[in-house]
UniProtKB/Swiss-Prot annotation:
It comes from Salmonella paratyphi C (strain RKS4594). Belongs to the ThiG family. The gene is thiG. The keyword Nucleotide-binding does not apply. The lineage of its organism: Bacteria, Pseudomonadati, Pseudomonadota, Gammaproteobacteria, Enterobacterales. PANTHER family: THIAZOLE SYNTHASE. This is Thiazole synthase.
Length: 256
């Protein structure tokens, strides 16, 4: 069970809604993933119509919506988008994204911290997408963010946990949930994140662009479950030296 702010989730896999070939395929993949929290880019939705091709099937699916501010380049733009989302969708939950460079889509740490502090004061449950910077994540926690979402690698790159060393520090020091976001390309990446101690992962591109998104969503669900179980089982310590699992000499002495 995962608790963030005022909500609890059975699934530790969060999903996105971008890049799917159709809304129907998107919903089928989300259902196969078991995800209960789904991100939604405000710039891709017609907030005036609840029969929007993306929004309507998500509402029908009964998932918790996490609108995001993707496309915002400044704190002011992100705050404005957040206020629109709260009014239109009736939710105070928000994934805060501010990335001014369209090529790399890396989050702006200064604008993110600035916006997060303001949005928390306005009553939002803020989940900020941020770089894998332990100091920044601690500052975001201190201003009241309900979780932190450090990247594993650039958005949509499928590179995996390139920031593993920093993620380990973030996880160790955090007192709010840590959701590894961006760069997760295959289910084994997700399993590794959960084994490391992350509370959840957010996956979009890896599922949406697969030849079979529904099958890939299922694979991610199973990988996240496996990673969580492995962590709870407490793996043995790594060792520099070999350690035999069977006697090396006893059987020879018995035959002598």
């Amino acid at each position: 069970m995962l608790r963030i702010a005022d909500k609890t989730f059975d699934s530790h896999l969060f999903t996105g809604t971008g890049k799917f070939a159709s809304s129907q395929l998107m919903v089928e993949a989300i259902r196969a993933s078991g995800s209960q929290l789904v991100t939604l880019a405000m710039k891709r939705v017609d907030l005036r119509q609840h029969n929007d091709a993306i929004l309507a099937p998500l509402i029908e699916a009964g998932v918790t919506l996490l609108p995001n501010t993707s496309g915002a380049k400044t704190a002011e733009e992100a705050i404005f988008a957040a206020q629109l989302a709260r009014e239109a969708l009736g939710t105070h939950w928000l994934k805060l994204e501010i990335h001014p460079d369209a090529r790399w889509l890396l989050p702006d740490p200064i604008e993110t911290l600035k916006a997060a502090e303001a949005l928390v004061k306005q009553g939002f449950v803020v989940l900020p997408y941020c770089g894998a910077d332990p100091v920044l994540c601690k500052r975001l926690e201190e201003v009241g963010c309900a979780a932190v979402m450090p990247l594993g690698a650039p958005i949509g790159s499928n590179q995996g946990l390139e920031t593993k060393a920093m993620l380990e520090i973030i996880i160790q020091q955090a007192t709010v949930p840590v959701v590894v976001d961006a760069g997760i390309g295959v289910p084994s990446h997700a399993a590794q994140a959960l084994e490391m101690g992350a509370d959840a992962v957010l996956v979009n591109t890896a599922i949406a662009v697969a030849d079979d998104p529904v099958m890939m969503a299922t694979a991610f669900r199973l990988a996240v479950e496996a990673g969580l179980l492995a962590r709870q089982a407490v793996p043995g310590n790594r060792s520099t030296y070999a350690s035999a699992t069977s006697p090396l000499t006893g059987f020879l002495e018995a035959l002598a």
